[in-house]
């Protein structure tokens, strides 16, 4: 690791003075997995010396001990300055130094990018400062993170199912990875890659798909950098087939399975789940072998096989156990236009949306058998954007009338759940709005003052007329006398 003190001699002793009029705030160490993208937030301030608002401000990020005078920066907003070939098109200065921002975007991070980085600002004839003591260290780690796959515990043959794959590493201005799916249950057309921060897959399983693998692949911009997650499909058997028994139980129930065999010599008994031996007996022990599941869980679903074996042969019977449970962990995943960050929203969340923006809502839950999903807007039922994916609601262009409450319902024979989101739709306000409001306020105030003046003049006029009338009557009385 390159130590920070090695950066300090780059510009000579004159650059080591800590001038309080120059400051920069940046995270000391920035970790990023290899091949991924990260945003380095950075803010700075510098004295107003030798420049005005029309003076261009240039910012430069340099690596390690690079000389700002002769070396190439890794990123800059100065179009006349060449950047280093190794970081071209990957490092980008997204902040505006003229507005106090020096934020940096690093895409497709590589092992050789691991180093210290410092910032330099130039504006006018006097502001030329390198923030050597405020450098940050970029730590490039191995990509160990895997995508998350959301799939029902047990699939019903012949019934459509929706599977969601999410890779939870997303920043604004960072490119989205490419998703693809592979598995025996999928046709070749289902394996085409798509670019997003999550992928929604719909397919209809068959009994032959039971115990096969389904894999979600996430590929990044750099070749060879990828992540994947594999799940094993559990497709329920709808009828007794040969030596297989199908059993449905509710989550939390007590279950005791008994394996017994008559044989001579006595057989060795065993209980096997998939390919894993759960328990076994000795030939000289009891002629039965019990397996207790005191509170069955969703993960207990699968094929349990009772095996009996002695030196003369073997037999086995299988039981497919399906654990039924109502919807759990119901939530909504939201993807907004111009925002690549995927949001997980819980019940009661308020969502601020700009008018005209596109919005994609994906309702996700775990249940067995799969819950029936639907959307409502207020009291009105909203049809799904994709009939095969009732949990997906697409709003291509949000309007002001969309303001209100959107609710996803998950209905199930064992219970139902719902999650509601409150939409607040805002329109973009123009720069003249405040001026118009102020002008209207001033006109209203002037009209109000004018009305008050007219009322006062009217009152004074009435009083004068009344006084004159009174004087006239007094004069008439005097003549009569």
Swiss-Prot record:
It is found in: Membrane. GO terms for biological process: cell adhesion; positive regulation of defense response to bacterium; positive regulation of interleukin-6 production. InterPro entries: Ig-like_dom (IPR007110), Ig-like_dom_sf (IPR036179), Ig-like_fold (IPR013783), Ig/MHC_CS (IPR003006), Ig_I-set (IPR013098), Ig_sub (IPR003599), Ig_sub2 (IPR003598), Ig_V-set (IPR013106). Residues 456-481 are cytoplasmic. Disulfide bonds join 37-174, 42-102, 165-216, 259-306, 363-408. Expressed in bone marrow, fetal brain, fetal liver, lung and salivary gland. Detected in brain, macrophage, cancerous esophagus and lung at protein level. N-acetylneuraminate binds at residue 120. PROSITE patterns: IG_LIKE. Residues 1-16 form the signal peptide. Putative adhesion molecule that mediates sialic-acid dependent binding to cells. PANTHER family: SIALIC ACID BINDING IMMUNOGLOBULIN-LIKE LECTIN, SIALIC ACID-BINDING IG-LIKE LECTIN 11. This is Sialic acid-binding Ig-like lectin 16.
């Amino acid at each position: 690791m390159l130590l920070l003190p090695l950066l300090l001699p780059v510009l000579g002793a004159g650059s080591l003075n800590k001038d309080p009029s120059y400051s920069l705030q940046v995270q000391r160490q920035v970790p990023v997995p290899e091949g991924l993208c990260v945003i380095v937030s950075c803010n700075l301030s510098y004295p107003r010396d030798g420049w005005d608002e029309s003076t261009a401000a240039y910012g430069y990020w340099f690596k390690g001990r690079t000389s700002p005078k002769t070396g190439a920066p890794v990123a800059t907003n100065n179009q006349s300055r060449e950047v280093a070939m190794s970081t071209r098109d990957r490092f980008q200065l997204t902040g505006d130094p003229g507005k106090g921002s020096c934020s940096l975007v690093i895409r497709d991070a590589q092992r050789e990018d691991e180093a210290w980085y410092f910032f330099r600002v130039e504006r006018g004839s006097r502001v030329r400062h390198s923030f050597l003591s405020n450098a940050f260290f970029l730590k490039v780690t191995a990509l160990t993170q895997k995508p998350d796959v959301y799939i029902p515990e047990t699939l019903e043959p012949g019934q459509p199912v929706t599977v969601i794959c999410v890779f939870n590493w997303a920043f604004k201005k960072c490119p989205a990875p490419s998703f693809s799916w592979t598995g025996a249950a999928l046709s070749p057309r289902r394996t085409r890659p798509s670019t997003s921060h999550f992928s929604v897959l719909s397919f209809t399983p068959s009994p032959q798909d039971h115990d096969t693998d389904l894999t979600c692949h996430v590929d990044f911009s750099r070749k060879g950098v990828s992540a994947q997650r594999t799940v094993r499909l559990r497709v329920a058997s709808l009828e007794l087939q040969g030596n297989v028994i199908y059993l449905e139980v509710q989550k939390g129930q007590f279950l005791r399975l008994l394996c017994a065999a008559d044989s001579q010599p006595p057989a060795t008994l065993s209980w096997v789940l998939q390919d894993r031996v759960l328990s076994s007996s000795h030939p000289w022990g009891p002629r039965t072998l019990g397996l207790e599941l005191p509170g069955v869980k969703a993960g207990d679903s699968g094929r349990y096989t009772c095996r009996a074996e002695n030196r003369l042969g073997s037999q086995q019977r299988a039981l497919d156990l399906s654990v039924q449970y109502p919807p759990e962990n119901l939530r909504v995943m939201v993807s907004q236009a111009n925002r690549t960050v995927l949001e997980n929203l819980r019940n009661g969340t308020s969502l601020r949306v700009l008018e005209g923006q596109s919005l994609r809502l994906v309702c996700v839950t775990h249940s067995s058998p799969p819950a029936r999903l639907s959307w409502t807007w207020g009291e009105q039922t909203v049809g799904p954007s994709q009939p095969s994916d009732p949990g997906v609601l697409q709003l291509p262009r949000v309007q002001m009338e969309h303001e209100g409450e959107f609710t996803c319902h998950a209905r199930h024979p064992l219970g139902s759940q719902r999650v509601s989101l409150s939409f607040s739709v805002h329109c973009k306000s123009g720069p003249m709005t405040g001026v118009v409001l102020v002008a209207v306020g001033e006109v209203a105030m002037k009209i109000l003052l004018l009305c008050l003046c007219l009322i006062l003049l009217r009152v004074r006029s009435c009083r004068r007329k009344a006084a004159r009338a009174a004087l006239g009557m007094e004069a008439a009385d005097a003549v009569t006398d």
